[in-house]
Amino acid sequence: MLYRLRSLQPIWRQMRLSVAFPYITLLLWILPLLLFNSGQNSLMAHDEGLYAWRARQMLDSGDWIAPWGNAHHKTPGPYWIIASCYKLFGISEFSGRIPNMIAGILVLFLVYEISKILLAKNLAWLTGAILSIEFLWLQYCRLGTPDMPMILLVLLAIFSLIKAELYPKYSHFWTLIAGLSFGLGFLVRSFMIFVPIIALLPYLVLEHRRHRHLINPLLYLGFVVGLIPTFSWLWFNWQRYGNVSFEQLFKFVLDLGSDDRNHNGAFFYIWNIPLKSFPWFFFSLLGLVLVLRRPIPRYHLILVGFPLVMFAELSLFSTRLSHYSLCIYPFIAMLAAVGLNWLGRIYETGLIQKDIPTQSPLKKGGNIFIPPFLRVAGGNLPRNLSYATGVLGILLLLGAIFVFVWGSADIRKYAILGLIVGLGWLILPVVWISRYHFGQKFLTARYWIAGWLIPCWLALAVAGSLGLLGDYNPVYRTFLQQKAIASVLQTHPIYFVQLGGKNSVLLNFYTPIHGERVNTISQLPASSYAWIYTKNSLEPSKPYRILGKVQDYQLIQVIP
């Protein structure tokens, strides 16, 4: 058996040298995280449900301009993408999420390529692995929203600008692609595309004497070409609704910039980003310190300037939501890879000076660079972090056991998650103790770094398998799947009587045959069926019977 393994070593070595190997391994790393589910799906209200419902309206009506009967406040790119998937694969939650899954994979590959240029090849793969297991990032890779397609276009533009600088012979082509990406970004995300564009200005302006992107006419030509689909849509909208078409687009972005609809304060992202990217945000802070001490040649204003400027923009913007910060997450992953790689080398060598790869941004005279304030504690950090994660793992295991024994059936699935994640967090102390107390020197930095990646991967894989990343409204799903309710919905038009609340969009999407929208029950025909919102004070001017109730909504039938 040992002979066979040794005979396979040259084959494995050749595979690792293959150009496609990093992409294949990253794909194998993220695919289970995208696909694992409980076998049931339901949409997230409010945003995902809105995009799913509006895309379905386009497909059902055949009107791909404005099927809702009035001027719209958003550009139609996301609706066109989702509706196209409905046409190809049928109307379902999974079909609406396919574009984001594909975009998420392509973003992963782009981040790998960008990191390979900015950092080093080994750090590029680690960046991709970390990005895949950032919670908010993975969650939105599995949702039918426009965030991933926009980020794909933004990163494609950044990659193209870097390639244009690296290869002057093909700079016109790459600059055209950058402009085209920004133009198409407007189709996907409207004026929000200007947030990352502004975040790139430090690089574009302060490094202009070197790359001269801003005076390249193909950048602007590409931007205009990318705007053609949006201009075409606006033209058809203008023919129907006049100047209101333009007013709605501007009004929406002005409202977002002037009204804090969610009451998230100016410090929202200071706590939200660390929470939604745990634990990688804290590694990224270490990476940021290291990179600030030893700046990346040429691209420092991309690696550091872009996320910092974007963070400031989003904090100043009145409407603050978690997913607005998603453009920062690839850069958190890059900086986290720098920090984790540095800790891995300290784990393996302590504070002993040792050569590191020449492509690393953390080199100083060919030796490991240790900032002065970390020089004393640096050698203890890997050990302390290993033991801290072990304590966390034990606490999770104890909590999971407690829930299994005394918890209700509804929360026991969280106990499964706690049990598996708790076991995963024990990897780090086991690796540390095995190397430094039992002399297992084969447990190099790669094993220690894997001890960070594996528990996070397991946590998200189990969360997906339990339905926590795909089945957001199981109450509505189970209600609508009831035989008595499903038979009515499938065979009769359903009227809507002044539905309110953010979950009403779920009823819009899951109701196959729509009747009219009316203001009162008295407007309903005899024997008709309707959804009503119980929080509205409706006068029951006609007698009706309640067929079922889900939260604040009732399905009724008017008694003849």
Question: Where do the model's predicted regions map?
Answer:
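Transmembrane-helix motifs of polytopic, lipid-linked glycan transferases
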Residues: 98-118, 156
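Transmembrane-helix signature of polytopic, membrane-embedded enzymes
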Residues: 19-26, 111-133
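Start-transfer (signal-anchor) and selected internal transmembrane alpha helices
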Residues: 1-33, 222-224
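Membrane-interface transmembrane helices that cradle and orient dolichyl/undecaprenyl
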Residues: 157-174, 340-343
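Short acidic/glycine- and proline-prone juxtamembrane loop motifs at membrane-interface regions
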Residues: 142-150
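Transmembrane-lumen/periplasm boundary regions of multi-pass, lipid-linked membrane glycan transferases
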Residues: 51-56, 184, 188, 193-339, ...
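Membrane-embedded architecture of ER/inner-membrane glycosylation machinery
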Residues: 2-7, 176, 291-315, 319-359, ...
